Amino acid sequence: MKILYLDCFSGISGDMMVGALVDAGVPSEKIEVELKKLSLSGYKLQWGKVVKKGISATKFDVIIQESIEGGHHHQSHHAHRHYSDIIDMIRRSELSEEVKQRAGQIFHCIAVAEAKIHGIPVENVHFHEVGAVDSIVDIVATAIALTELHIDYIISAPIPLGHGSIRCAHGVYPVPAPATLEILQGVPVVSNHLPFELTTPTGAGIVKSQVNSYGPLPSMKISAIGYGAGTRDLPDQPNVLRVVIGEETRITSSGPSLFHSKEETVYILECQLDDMPGEALGYVMDGLFQKGALDVFYTPVFMKKNRPGVLLTVLTSATHVEQCEQFMLKETTTLGIRKDIWVREVLERDVVTVATSYGNIRVKQAIHKGKVIRQMPEYEDVKEAALTHQVAFLDVYAEAAEQARRRIKGE
């Protein structure tokens, strides 16, 4: 398992994250090539080496060309974009599905926080700082770099916040900014004496949406270390984000895996229906899976005026939220959709192939603490074998399960 550890002793921002990942080995040329797949212009990327309190680090900057031409510093340039515009731009791009998913997760995490703070629906969130070109580039570049590194599991140290005040689009706000604090609910944070904003909303969104667990540096075989520089010079410590990359190690050859499960962010869409025929409900379920839903199910409910109906529940990733939502509004009779964001704990899993008298059958395995605790023959393989050999489904299933059990025991 390939692990990424975020050592955020001076906080985290989008540009620090990108700089650290490039410093750890991601080619900057790869990020530049991939970013060209976005329908985004008016900027150029700048990479350089700087020294922060004795530590050499990679500094990443997004230079807004329109602002340069107008004689203004790039940080004062803030394009105003809606969340839906940004997600649509990412979805329509030729970026890989993993990059789209990671970037969508980060933006959705920030949008949910902004919506709560401003008291508006998520789809109406109007971004200022995070809608600016430089922040869009920071987030998508982070997704590109994580995908390029093939990271399986991310751990972070507690997040330092700083204190004081900052000026943003709505005026002078306290540090940490309201969006940062809202995003980091449930995340271990630490305060310190530094009167600066150490963690930005973009940095908080990256942490909340991408990190699987929090704590000290785990036991691992280190393969790369990277430092990403922030802009400000801190008085007593280097303003850098350190990332450590390596492979999971075990304490002993027979010891359990250090990582028993991981957290994933899923998005919930729901609506109640009492005036649709069963055939239409079946069509809706099929269509939602085609749109990228992770799961779709109906729950019987009684609605107003004692009408029997169903509660339609859809689980999906951030990348496919809007597609599923639009499909529900188009293909069902609902007048609105409830949306929520959940975090789920999932076991490590893999798939093995076993030989049976009916042919090869794939078997899904659930793994906990390094041990296989459950094995489930794949339905489609079992079904195909049963139909091909004209035998009972359960006969094929039982033999595949037995062969998988023997494989684990080395028989």
Swiss-Prot record:
It catalyses: Ni(II)-pyridinium-3,5-bisthiocarboxylate mononucleotide = pyridinium-3,5-bisthiocarboxylate mononucleotide + Ni(2+). One of its GO terms (biological process) is protein maturation. GO terms for molecular function: lyase activity; nickel cation binding. Belongs to the LarC family. This is Pyridinium-3,5-bisthiocarboxylic acid mononucleotide nickel insertion protein. Keywords: Lyase, Nickel. Involved in the biosynthesis of a nickel-pincer cofactor ((SCS)Ni(II) pincer complex). Binds Ni(2+), and functions in nickel delivery to pyridinium-3,5-bisthiocarboxylic acid mononucleotide (P2TMN), to form the mature cofactor. Is thus probably required for the activation of nickel-pincer cofactor-dependent enzymes. It is an enzyme of class 4 (lyase). The gene is larC. Its EC number is 4.99.1.12. Pfam families: Ni_insertion. It comes from Geobacillus kaustophilus (strain HTA426).
